[in-house]
Amino acid sequence: MKLKFDEYVLNKPLKDDERIVEHAQFIALYRNWFKEEHIEHFLEYWAWCHNNGIHARDRHASEGAHPLEKKDYALGMDKGYYGDEKIHSELQLTHEFNDFFKYMNNEIIRQYSFEYPDVGHPVAHEGKIQNTQPSEGYHVWHSEWNYEVPRRQLAYALFLNDVDEGGELEFLHQSIRIKPRKGDMVVWPAFWSHLHRGNPPLSGEKWIVTGWFEQLGVHNDITFEE
């Protein structure tokens, strides 16, 4: 297993129709897997929500978090819905981001599970669009799994813009920092082995889409499985 990303592969210019995946310590970086029209869809949805009275919430409002621990603004884009603590047998598909979740549950997860077969078939069905201003960020080391969210197996982050300075997705034990680059996605294990944080952007704001792949034990239209 590679311990570090290949810096040449990580930074080389790619043609419009070229896409690559680089792996290191169970962290996968998908370069150029999302195009301009995909990115604009999220930003247009954020603007539409804002113009129609649906506003993003900061961490203090949503979690009671102190801004020195974590601060950003997020707008949910959940696809699944829960009842009585259990996922319904069919996930709802009447949603703005159907194509995104189908792409995640086919192209993205299949490539990851090809590299790491024991991951199984987790499903991406929820996420959020997140905006981080200079000096803001997720400052504390954390994982994406705990007793309240035991189904989470992988986390993902899609960068919606370039950040010239700062704003890295940083992994503590792996000593890896990933620079935000528009159209790139990172997928990594949700567990304690991959403690991470989102560093403050220094040169301007940072936009991402982030969420999780969960072991739900269901087959549905999202994954094109019967």
Which residues does each PLM region occupy?
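Non-heme Fe(II)/2-oxoglutarate
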Residues: 2-116
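Conserved, well-structured core segments
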Residues: 32, 128-131, 158
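Short beta-strand segments enriched in hydrophobic/aromatic residues
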Residues: 34, 46, 160, 213-215
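Glycine-rich, acidic and aromatic/proline-enriched surface loops and short helix-turn segments
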Residues: 48, 134, 159-163, 191-192
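Acidic, glycine-rich loop-and-strand cores that form catalytic or ligand-binding grooves
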Residues: 118-133
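Conserved short histidine dyad/triad with adjacent acidic residue
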Residues: 129-149
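Catalytic core of Fe(II)/2-oxoglutarate
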Residues: 140, 148-152, 163-226
